[in-house]
A protein has these predicted regions:
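Bacterial N-terminal signal peptides that target proteins for export
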Residues: 1-11
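Bacterial N-terminal signal peptides
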Residues: 10-19
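Binuclear metal-dependent hydrolase catalytic cores
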Residues: 2, 26-215, 221, 304, ...
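Sec/Tat signal peptide C-region and signal peptidase I cleavage site
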Residues: 20-26
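Cap/insert and terminal regions of metallo-dependent hydrolase folds
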Residues: 200-204, 210-215, 221-321, 325-326
Length: 331
C-alpha cells in the first residue's frame, strides 16, 4: 500500500513539474499562463498610411473574462477579429488613440458588421476630441446601407441607436468590473506650430485588469507622461518607427517623387518628431520598469520583413523581454 502511495505521489509531482514547465515556456513566449483572465491579441501590426499584404493596420483587442475591448481599428480590423474567432456582435467597447486613418479606417466597417450581427446593445467608442464626430460620420456613411437592410426586414433597430462616440480627456476614462483604462496625452502631435498647435490630441492608454497591466503607447514621440503611465506594466505595446525605412519605401513606390518639397519636409518632421525610435523605446521601458516590450505599428522595411535587428537595438537599452508583434499574435 505504501509503495502504491509513493508511486501516486511521484506521479503527481511529475505532472506538476511538467505543468509548471509548460507554463514557464508559455510565459517566455509572451503568452500568459492558462489561469490568467486577460488576453491580448495584436490584430494589426503595420504602420500607416500604406497597405501591406502581410499585416493589417493598427488594431488590438484585450479580452478580460470573455469581454472584448478593442484598441484602435485600422484597415483590416474586422477581418482580423473574425480570424481571431471573435464574434463582431460581441464587441461593445472601442478605444481610439488618435484620428490618423491607419488607426480608424476600419472603424466604420467594424461598426456596420457588428450591427449586421443583430447587435442592439450600445457600442461605445472612446477617444480624443472629435471621436463623437468620427462615430457620427461613420454612422452617416453606412446610413444608406442600413436603411435598405431595415426596408428588407432584416433589421429593425436603426444603426444610430447602437453606436455612441465619447470625447475624453486625460485621466481614468473608463472602468467596469474587469478593467480600468487611464489615458494621457502623448507627443505625437506636439511638433505642430501655428494654427494647428494644440488642436489635435493623441493618447496613450493604460489597461489595468485583475491580473495584468497593459500599456499602449499609440503613436508618440518621446514623452515623460507616457513613461509615467507605463510604470510597472506587464506589457508595453510600443509603436515602432523608422524614418529612413519609411522614406525609402515612399521612394520605391513613387510617392516621394510626387510630393512637393514642403510635403517631403512635413512627412520627415512628423516621422522623426512624432514617433519614437528604437533607442527611445528601450530607454522608456527601462525607466518605466516594464516587464516585456511588444514592438508593433511596424514601418515597412525595404527588401526584408526581418525586424530582429530592431528588437536587438531596443535590448541595448532594456534588459527585459522584447517581442516583435505579428498579426493575430496572442499574449
Amino acid at each position: 500500500m505504501q509503495n502504491r502511495s509513493s508511486l501516486l505521489l511521484t506521479t503527481l509531482i511529475s505532472i506538476s513539474v511538467i505543468s509548471l514547465s509548460h507554463e514557464s515556456m508559455a510565459q517566455s513566449r509572451g503568452v500568459p499562463s492558462p489561469k490568467a483572465v486577460t488576453r491580448l491579441i495584436t490584430l494589426g501590426t503595420a504602420s500607416g498610411p500604406s497597405t501591406r499584404p502581410d499585416r493589417a493596420q493598427s488594431s488590438n483587442v484585450v479580452t478580460v473574462n470573455g469581454t472584448h475591448y478593442v484598441v484602435d481599428a485600422g484597415d483590416g480590423a474586422a477581418r482580423r477579429l473574425a480570424e481571431a474567432g471573435i464574434d463582431l456582435g460581441e464587441i461593445g467597447i472601442i478605444f481610439v488613440t488618435h484620428h490618423h486613418d491607419d488607426h480608424t479606417a476600419g472603424l466604420g466597417t467594424l461598426m456596420s458588421l457588428a450591427w449586421d450581427r443583430q447587435r442592439t446593445k450600445p457600442i461605445h467608442v472612446y477617444g480624443p476630441p472629435r471621436t463623437e464626430e468620427l462615430v457620427k460620420a461613420a454612422v452617416q456613411y453606412f446610413a444608406i446601407s442600413a436603411e435598405i437592410r431595415i426596408a428588407d426586414g432584416g433589421r429593425t433597430v436603426p444603426i444610430a441607436q447602437v453606436f455612441f462616440g465619447h470625447d475624453v480627456g486625460s485621466g481614468v476614462i473608463y472602468q467596469d468590473a474587469n478593467i480600468k483604462v487611464t489615458a494621457v496625452e502623448n507627443s505625437h502631435f506636439a511638433f505642430h506650430d501655428g494654427p494647428a498647435s494644440g488642436k489635435y490630441k493623441s493618447y496613450s492608454y493604460r489597461f489595468e485588469t485583475p491580473d495584468r497591466v497593459i500599456v499602449f503607447t499609440g503613436d508618440t514621440g518621446t514623452s515623460d507622461a507616457v513613461t509615467e503611465l507605463a510604470k510597472g506594466a506587464d506589457l508595453l505595446v510600443a509603436e515602432t518607427s523608422s524614418s529612413e525605412d519609411r522614406k525609402q519605401a515612399m521612394i520605391n513606390d513613387g510617392r516621394w517623387q510626387a510630393m512637393t518639397p514642403s510635403e517631403q519636409a512635413g512627412i520627415m518632421r512628423q516621422a522623426t518628431q512624432g514617433h519614437m525610435n528604437l533607442v527611445d523605446i528601450g530607454k522608456m521601458a527601462t525607466r518605466a520598469n516594464v516587464k516585456t516590450v511588444v514592438l508593433s505599428h511596424l514601418t515597412q522595411r525595404v527588401g526584408t520583413d526581418d525586424y530582429t535587428p530592431w528588437a536587438e537595438e531596443v535590448k541595448k537599452h532594456f534588459s527585459g523581454q522584447v517581442l516583435i508583434a505579428k498579426d493575430l499574435m496572442r499574449f
